[in-house]
Amino acid sequence: MVRISLDVMGGDYGPEVVIPGAARALERHPDIKFVLFGQEARCIELLAKHPKLKASSTFHDCEIAVGMDEKPSQALRRGRGKSSMWKAIDAINADEADVVVSAGNTGALMAMSVFCLRTMQGIQRPAIAAIWPTLKGESIVLDVGATIGADAQQLMDFALMGGAMARALFEVERPSVGLLNVGVEEIKGQEEVKEAGRLIREADVEGIEYYGFVEGDDIGRGTVDVVVTEGFSGNIALKAAEGTARQIAEYLRAAMSRTLLARVGYVFAKGAFDRLREKMDPRKVNGGVFLGLNGIVIKSHGGADAEGFAAAIDVGYDMVKNGLKAKIEADLARYHGAQPSEAVPRA
C-alpha cells in the first residue's frame, strides 16, 4: 500500500481537478490509500461521484486554502497548522502518508515543505526536479526553480539527488549526469559550474556516471540521464521547452487545416500525428519532485487537468515504490560521511 496525501484545494481548479485526478490514479494503482485535505463543503459532492475513491480515502476538513498568488511568507503565517497545504505535508510527519502531492502555489509549497519536513542531513538547499521528454525517452533536469544561483557544493548535491531519482524512476544502475553549461569545453562557464564539475569528477560517486558539461540542446537529445543546473537557468529552460512544445503544436494544427489537400493528408497521417501529440503532451510528464527533504513532495502544474494531476500522483507513487528517499539518504551518507536519518524531525 502507498499512502498519498493530497492538497485538494491546491491549483487553479482545486477539488474540481484533484478529486477526479485522484480517481484516475486509483484506477491505475488500486493499492493507493489517499489522505485528502480540503474544504468539505466544496468536496463532498465531488467525492460522492467517485465511490471507489471515497472508499479508499480519509478526508480531513481544513478551514484555509492557500491562494495561488500568496507570498510564501504570508502563506506560512496564515496557513501554518490550518491550511490544506500544510496539513497535507504534515501528514508525512504524522506517519499518515508516504508522499504528498499538491498543485498549489510553488513558493508556498516549497516554504511549507522546508519548514515542516526540514532538509536531509548534508543538504543546504532543496531542488525541484522535472521529468523531461527526450529523443531517447526521458531524463531528469534539476534544479528548475528552487535554488537561484546555486554554488558548486549545492550543484554537487543536486547531482547526487538527481542520480538517485534516475535510479528510482528509470531503474538505471549508474545513470549518466551532466552539468548544464555554455559549452562542453572545460575552460568554459562560470566558476561555480567548473568547480562543481571538479567536485563530481573527483568524488567518483558509486551511484552516478559523470559525463561532463552538456549544452541546452543536449537536454532534448537525451545525451544524459540527469542534467544538473541552478534554479534560474533551469526554470528558463523548462518554460522555454513548454512554450516550444505549444508553438509546434499550433504550427501543426494550422498547417493541417490550411488547405483541402492538407486535411486529406492529415487523415492518412493521423496515427503518426497522434503519437507526436502524445509525446509532446505536457500532462504525461507533470509532477516536479522536491528533492533534499525528509519526505517526498510532488508539485503538479497549477493549471493541470484531471489527467495531468493523475500523472503527478503516478510520479509520487513510483518514487515511493522504488525507494527514492532511502536511495538519496544512502548516497548522501556515502558522500558526506553522514548517517541516514532514523526518523523525520517534526517542525
Swiss-Prot record:
In this UniProt entry, which cysteines form S-S bonds? none
Pathway assignment reads: Lipid metabolism; phospholipid metabolism
Localisation per UniProt entry: Cytoplasm
A Gene Ontology BP annotation from the UniProt entry:
fatty acid biosynthetic process
State the Pfam families in the record. FA_synthesis
Report keywords, A-Z: Cytoplasm, Lipid biosynthesis, Lipid metabolism, Phospholipid biosynthesis, Phospholipid metabolism, Transferase
Q: Name one GO molecular function term.
A: phosphate:acyl-[acyl carrier protein] acyltransferase activity
Is the keyword Ligase assigned to this protein? no
Provide the catalytic activity annotation: a fatty acyl-[ACP] + phosphate = an acyl phosphate + holo-[ACP]
**Does this UniProt record's set of keywords contain Iron?**
no
Query: What's its EC?
Result: 2.3.1.274
Q: Which GO cellular component terms, listed alphabetically, does the Swiss-Prot or TrEMBL entry include?
A: cytoplasm
What does this gene product do?
Answer: Catalyzes the reversible formation of acyl-phosphate (acyl-PO(4)) from acyl-[acyl-carrier-protein] (acyl-ACP). This enzyme utilizes acyl-ACP as fatty acyl donor, but not acyl-CoA.
Q: Which family does it belong to?
A: Belongs to the PlsX family.
PANTHER family (UniProt xref): FATTY ACID/PHOSPHOLIPID SYNTHESIS PROTEIN PLSX (PTHR30100), PHOSPHATE ACYLTRANSFERASE (PTHR30100:SF1)
Self-association or partners: how does it assemble? Homodimer. Probably interacts with PlsY.
Q: What is this protein called?
A: Phosphate acyltransferase
Naturally occurring in which organism (per UniProt): Rhizobium meliloti (strain 1021) (Ensifer meliloti)
Q: From the UniProt record, report the name of the gene that encodes this protein.
A: plsX
